[in-house]
């Protein structure tokens, strides 16, 4: 019996057999301006010749799976002959879902996995639980960790003790990668070019140029300087999808600091946008979201736990999710948490080698556990007892 591990994120699906490697694939469908009638699914995005003005059709809204038609089509593609050629009669599935997922969504997922696809056994689990499992496997002497999962829709801060989540201390911050990309689109549209329809391009800009500032006000001062002294300023060449397929940053020595470029390239000049956008993760109030930033929320979450456990959490802070890839993210989380923590506590912040696939790797390890069979719900169980057996088994 093989096991398929699917970390079903709101932006990317991380999928692969437990004996194999992982693929990161867009969990959505696309329509392009040029081929209006055709819908592209998942990694068919690579077939789109001109991805400008790309229209996204997402199965998730605000972090919850609501568009089942789109999700089914993405899964059909992933499980079908183009990708994983799943033999449902000989396959179990480990699949992730959000914290405190709605009962109706959980039941729909049971029905689709068991009744439509007919998997032999299912384990539905939070992505953070898989990350915690991976962390405890790598650090067997540790009993506690706090998973900071900063993804597309929002950021969750979840303490785990002996692989059990502490529900009373879970915190959700309503800031994720989607909000950052949208904010960058608004800033650029207001200051330079109208890019409100260019989600795909601006998301790439964000990933290429943004970083987390270690000293926001100092960087702001540098960004105001003229010419060579402004080390923050960068020129980004936008793709035209004929000669330039993917945007890139101009090397500093090629930057024209005054006047215009001779070549016909379309240029975005970015300065304080580079660090002001990721700053929202640390100060959501900058754009009117009255919530704590990530470091403050980590400390607040740990302070909600019994005092004797707190030192163990402070020294096992694990960063996962796409936003943790911003340069400087780990250092900023560490320095701010350190400032807010009693001096006699050790603080350690861990950034895994690949924070996007970290929970998938945890799922791969769980599938190799001796007690894996006790964790899943089999198809016979489900056919006999319905949703109630899933409700008992899965701690969502």
From Swiss-Prot:
Q: Which CDD domains match?
A: ASKHA_NBD_Arp6 (cd10210)
Residues modified to N6-acetyllysine: 260
Give the primary localization class: cytoplasm
Q: Does the keyword Transcription apply?
A: yes
Pfam families xref list? Actin
A GO cellular component term found in this entry reads: nucleolus
**UniProtKB keywords:** Acetylation, Activator, Cytoplasm, Cytoskeleton, Nucleus, Repressor, Transcription, Transcription regulation
> Mind telling me which InterPro entries this protein's record contains?
Actin (IPR004000), ATPase_NBD (IPR043129)
- Protein name as it appears in the record: Actin-related protein 6
Which source organism? Mus musculus
